[in-house]
Amino acid sequence: MAREGKRIRAAREGIDPTKVYSLADAVKLIKERAKAKFDETFEISMNLGVDPRHADQMVRGVCNLPNGSGRTVRVAVFARGAKADEAKAAGADIVGAEDLLETIQGGTINFDRCIATPDMMPLVGRLGKVLGPRGLMPNPKVGTVTMDVKGAVGAAKGGAVEFRVEKAGIVHAGIGKVSFDDQKIVENARAFADAVARAKPSGAKGTYIQRIAVSSTMGPGIKVDPASVLAAATA
């Protein structure tokens, strides 16, 4: 514990907790302080002016990160026939129908993203209580219920990140690795923030994007000026 405390203190050194940094400066500070023995994930957290308890203030969507996420994504696809073949050819890790349902019901969930063709949803719907809490339930709003199986698998493998606002009005996601070039992290952060901005619900009132912070997996959070993050939208 003493070693961990020393590492955390060292990571916080030189960071003013009261200051709001530009995105570029925050990225530099985080990369300089990422000393874990693995390639830490670069994370972004956005506080939104919404109350997700109201349906007209729910924020949900997907962002295709221009430089990928840096992580290996295992994709499962519910499909039959030609669409199952399409999924396999596109690189899906697991493809099935009733057999995949039984595997999941048996407690085996060894995938990070789940895609389904529309005709499979009555079957997939039986897994709502299992997949829903894990954020794995296919949903047409984020492109995971679709006939374009090839495109959906490609997007998932290529760095598509789903997001959904939490009860406290926060959206967060991993948007790369600290080993990425600074500019690639900046581009990913801006793409994600823009996707969240475009997903602004009709019921949102006042300032929509209130605060933004970035961090690495093991590092401290750094406050960031929203204006330095939003590339094509305003808070």
Curated annotation (Swiss-Prot):
Q: Which superkingdom heads the taxonomic lineage of this protein's source?
A: Bacteria
Q: Where is the signal peptide?
A: none
Which PROSITE patterns does the entry link to? RIBOSOMAL_L1
- Key words, A-Z: Repressor, Ribonucleoprotein, Ribosomal protein, RNA-binding, rRNA-binding, Translation regulation, tRNA-binding
Q: Name one GO molecular function term.
A: rRNA binding
Gene Ontology terms describing biological process: regulation of translation; translation
Q: Which family does it belong to?
A: Belongs to the universal ribosomal protein uL1 family.
Q: Give the protein's biological function.
A: Binds directly to 23S rRNA. The L1 stalk is quite mobile in the ribosome, and is involved in E site tRNA release.
Protein name per the record? Large ribosomal subunit protein uL1
Per the UniProt record, the lineage of the source organism begins with: Bacteria, Pseudomonadati, Pseudomonadota, Alphaproteobacteria, Hyphomicrobiales
